[in-house]
C-alpha cells in the first residue's frame, strides 16, 4: 500500500459537484503540486484554484486534507470538491496521475480502510450494500450492520469460544487431570447456546434475504387465466402482451418495482399445460424453475371455468414447494364456476382492478420485517453455518472427552467467525469482495 491512489468518488456524469479523492503517504505532496499553496491545514475546507502541472488553471473548488490516521482509509487523504460534470473532474484526475498518483482499483479505498483497521469486513460489506440498496427496509438493515451490530454479535461469540479454547489447551498439557464437572457443563451450555444463535441468524437471513435483495414473486397458472393482465396492472403499463390466444407468453418476463417500502422482482411465466409445443414447453420449464426460486407465488386460476387436471397439477407443484402462496381466482366479473376450495383465495377481475392483491402482498411483506440482526451476504451466511456446525461437533467431542479434537473444532469455529469480520486468509477473500465496490470507494 505504498502507492498513492486517486479516483473519482462521485458518480460519473453531469452534477453540481464532483469529488476527486487521493489516499496514501504522498497524498498531500501530490495534491500540492496542483495548488499554489505551501501546505493544507488538516480537516479545514480550503477554497483554492486548481492548476495543471503546466500551470493551466483547471477549476476553483474546495480542498480538504484528512491527516492519517484520522481518515476513512487510515492514510493521508485529500479531496478535491470541484464543479460537477465530466471534463473538470477528469482533467484534475489526469493531472494527479501525472503528479505521481495511481488510478485506484474498484473498492481499493475501502480495502485500505479494512487493512488499516478502520472497519471490519462486515461493516465494509454493509457499506457497499447500503450504496446499492433500493428499498427503505434494506437501507435500515444495512445501516444497522454498519453501526457494528453484527460485528458485536460475532465478537461476543468468538470471545467465548476463544476463552474456552485457551483453557482447554492448558488442560491438554495436564492430561492426567479431569475436567471440573461444573466447567464441563458450563462449556456444553455455551456450545449449544452459541450454535443455536448462529444457526438462527443464518436461517432467518436466508428466509428473509428478500428484505435486502428484493423478494422474488412468481405469477403462475394455466395459459390465458390473466397472469399478464395482473403483471400489467401491478406495473401500471403494458409490459406483457395480453391476448385471448393461449400460449401468448412463452418466455418469462421479469420486472422490479416497489410494494410499500419493499423491493420486489415480479416474474410472469408461461402458462403451465400438458399439450404445449416444443418452444412453449421450454417456457413452461422456466415457469417450474420460477416456482422453485421464488419467495412468494401468485397462483392464478380462471374463476369462470370449472377446474381441470392442469389446475390440480399447479396446486400440487405449489404445495410441494413449501413457499408462501396466494391463490387468485380471476375473472370475477363473469359467472363463478371454479370448484376447488382454496383457503384464503382472492377473487378479482384483473382487467378492472388488481389492487386487492397488492394490498395482500404489502401486508404479508410487512410481517417479514425484523428488528433482529441479519446477515447481508451469502458469504456471511455460509460462515455462520460453518461455525455453528463446528460448535456442534465440538459438543460431541467434549462429551467423549477427546480434548485434542475438541480443540480442533473450536479452532474451526473461530476461523469461520473470523471470516465474517477479520479473516485469517485475507488476500483472496478481500480481492474478490472489494473488486465489486464502486471506483473511488
UniProtKB/Swiss-Prot annotation:
Pfam families: MMR_HSR1, MnmE_helical, TrmE_N
Positions with a binding annotation for GTP: 224-229, 243-249, 268-271
Subcellular location: Cytoplasm
Cellular component annotations (GO), alphabetically ordered: cytosol
Positions with a binding annotation for Mg(2+): 228, 249
InterPro entries in the record: G_TrmE, GTP-bd, GTP-bd_TrmE_N, GTPase_MnmE, MnmE_dom2, MnmE_helical, P-loop_NTPase, Small_GTP-bd
Domain TrmE-type G: 214-370
GO biological process: tRNA methylation; tRNA wobble uridine modification
Residues that coordinate or bind (6S)-5-formyl-5,6,7,8-tetrahydrofolate: 21, 79, 118, 441
UniProt remark on cofactor binding: Binds 1 potassium ion per subunit.
GO molecular function annotations of the record: GTP binding; GTPase activity; metal ion binding
Function: Exhibits a very high intrinsic GTPase hydrolysis rate. Involved in the addition of a carboxymethylaminomethyl (cmnm) group at the wobble position (U34) of certain tRNAs, forming tRNA-cmnm(5)s(2)U34.
Database matches in HAMAP family: GTPase_MnmE
Family: Belongs to the TRAFAC class TrmE-Era-EngA-EngB-Septin-like GTPase superfamily. TrmE GTPase family.
Subunit structure: Homodimer. Heterotetramer of two MnmE and two MnmG subunits.
Protein name: tRNA modification GTPase MnmE
Protein species of origin: Campylobacter concisus (strain 13826)
UniProt gene name: mnmE
